[in-house]
């Protein structure tokens, strides 16, 4: 069962990063319509990949990461809504507020369950959480700095998956880094005058 969850969660999350990279390449070519389609696809597959990830994290008692991953759903939906609308103006505020409620709940439960921050896994989860929440929020708002936060997320999540015996998810994190760096590089090319 965990193998299937790895392939589903890891596969859809990897597609998200690939599609984000394709979107940035299309923007650099001046094809905003194609960039928007890739961005819509990227947020859609991200949402589909969420449940397998949450199940995996819960099964290892990674409460911080699991609750934050689940609380990232509103930011993912926000990204999809913004991509569908084609504008970052007037996003639904309730999505932001909903995500913020889930974060302290997961963190608090992890502290309760483990009696404080007592494991390397919890420290890795904190890095994963920061990268995921800040990165997803910034990318939903179409801000390039979100890619840098995703680097933190992928490094800490990859390490966590490695030590917990999920080689496919570890590999998926490494491959995702390639696409994240590429997407960020594309945003920087647009900023440099030719």
Describe each region flagged by the PLM.
Residues 1-194:
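Alpha-helical membrane-protein topology signature
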């Amino acid at each position: 069962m965990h193998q299937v969850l790895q392939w589903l969660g890891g596969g859809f999350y990897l597609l998200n990063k690939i599609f984000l990279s394709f979107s940035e390449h299309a923007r650099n070519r001046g094809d905003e319509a194609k960039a928007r389609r890739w961005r819509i696809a990227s947020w859609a597959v991200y949402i589909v990949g969420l449940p397998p990830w949450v199940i995996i994290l819960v099964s290892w008692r990674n409460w911080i990461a699991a609750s934050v991953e689940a609380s990232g759903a509103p930011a993912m939906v926000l990204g999809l809504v913004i991509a569908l609308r084609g504008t970052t103006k007037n996003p639904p505020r309730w999505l932001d507020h909903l995500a913020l409620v889930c974060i302290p709940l997961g963190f608090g439960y992890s502290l309760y369950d483990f009696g404080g921050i007592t494991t390397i896994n919890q420290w890795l989860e904190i890095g994963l959480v920061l990268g995921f929440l800040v990165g997803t929020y910034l990318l939903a708002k179409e801000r390039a700095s979100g890619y840098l936060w995703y680097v933190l997320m992928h490094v800490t999540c990859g390490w966590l998956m490695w030590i917990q015996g999920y080689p496919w998810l570890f590999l998926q994190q490494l491959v995702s880094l390639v696409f994240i760096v590429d997407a960020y590089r594309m945003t920087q090319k647009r900023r440099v005058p030719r």
